[in-house]
């Protein structure tokens, strides 16, 4: 079961994301944080397979959260969400290693596909690393 952290300050959006991704057939375990500070604290304490993160949040915004996380964890996939979708923010988040950038309100099929693809890529990278160690 993949463990996903949703960091979103807007409660109605967070509730929708949790409901969609915690569908009984999804195979996802969901945790949530209402701001960037709570999100970074959870990332430090627990292991996640994916982070779904809003960009504009109080205390610590999504870009800063991504930057801080990348200092200690370069492999944790991030999907960035924003209601203020501009190209500069998308480019900045992708340069920092975000897997995807999705405008709010998200197209649900696109969101689910992006989550599944990010998790699949993470799994393949992990398998590749293990195989390389066996060969070496």
Regions found by a protein language model. Give the residues of each.
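Active-site beta3 strand of CheY-like receiver
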Residues: 46-52
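Helix N-cap/capping motif at the beta->alpha junctions
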Residues: 32-41, 62
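Active-site residues of response regulator receiver
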Residues: 54, 82
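Receiver (REC) domain active-site loop signature in two-component systems and cognate sites
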Residues: 57
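Two-component/phosphorelay signaling modules centered on CheY-like receiver
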Residues: 11-31
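Flexible nucleotide-interacting loop at or near the entrance of a catalytic core
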Residues: 110-136
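Short amphipathic alpha-helix used as the core "switch/output" element in two-component signaling
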Residues: 41, 63-75, 92
């Amino acid at each position: 079961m993949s463990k996903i952290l949703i960091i979103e300050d807007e409660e109605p959006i967070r509730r929708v994301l949790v409901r969609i991704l915690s569908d009984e057939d999804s195979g996802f375990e969901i945790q949530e944080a209402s701001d960037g500070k709570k999100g970074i604290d959870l990332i430090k304490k627990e292991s996640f397979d994916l982070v779904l993160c809003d960009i504009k949040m109080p205390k610590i915004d999504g870009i800063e959260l991504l930057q801080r996380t990348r200092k200690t964890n370069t492999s944790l996939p991030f999907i960035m969400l924003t209601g203020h979708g501009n190209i500069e923010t998308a480019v900045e988040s992708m340069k920092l290693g975000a897997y995807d950038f999705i405008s709010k309100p998200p197209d649900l099929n696109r969101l689910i596909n992006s989550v599944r693809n990010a998790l699949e890529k993470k799994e393949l990278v992990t398998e590749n690393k293990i195989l390389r160690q066996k060969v070496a």
